[in-house]
Amino acid sequence: MQLCVALDLEKKEDNLSLLQELKGLDLWAKVGLRSFIRDGAVFLDEIRKIDGNFKIFLDLKLYDIPYTMANAALECAKLEVDMLTVHLSSAKSALTILMQRLNALKKRPLIMGVSALTSFSEEEFLMVYNAPLKTQAIKLSAMGKESGIDGVVCSVFESLAVKEALGKDFLTLTPGIRLDKSDKEDQERVANAKEAKQNLSDFIVVGRPIYHAKEPREVVLELLKDC
């Protein structure tokens, strides 16, 4: 299991300062919408300057019509990121075209499909998708696998079911990881790192428990022990 550190702080300088503290550790730097829109592609180069061994996870959750989405993914791949997210709700045709475009490259990022955001409660998910959360997450994941993507973003509570249905080689990335599960904030389906490993998660995403800590590096070292 690998650790992705979410860089969601208010200022670019704060994100870079956090990474300076974590230099030399085996982790992924997750760049989301806020940081990428504010700081641009140059931010990715600044991450690499701090530690060239940090892998970069560009979490943009692409969602559009097929060719627009494929072209956007191609531009992201040109930035030499190591992982990229797309929405599974964009449907099989969009994902298939996207993967055809990326597979033509000598090197491409891992493509992870977002099934259900961890901010969804079961009730909210039913209202939007008219299906039970776990059932729909597996259905979307199966469609993603047929399209050729590498894995899915899901909560810890769907990870094991996805693996059982689609095989252990189909990757799962699980956000909503907390040190204290009572600290949900805007997430509904949270778990800790040990539970993520028990449920065969390949990647975990941790943000606020790290950068709200007095000693972020110590928190990361503890998380890495659980990985």
Swiss-Prot record:
Instruction: Give the E.C. number(s).
Output: 4.1.1.23
Specify whether Lyase is a keyword of the entry.
yes
UniProt keyword Membrane, yes or no: no
Q: Which residues bind substrate?
A: 8, 30, 59-68, 118, 178, 187, 207-208
Q: Which residues form the active site?
A: 61 (proton donor)
State the top-level EC class.
Answer: lyase
Q: What does this protein do?
A: Catalyzes the decarboxylation of orotidine 5'-monophosphate (OMP) to uridine 5'-monophosphate (UMP).
Family named by the database record: Belongs to the OMP decarboxylase family. Type 1 subfamily.
Q: What is this protein called?
A: Orotidine 5'-phosphate decarboxylase
Give the organism, scientific name: Helicobacter pylori (strain P12)
The protein's gene is named: pyrF
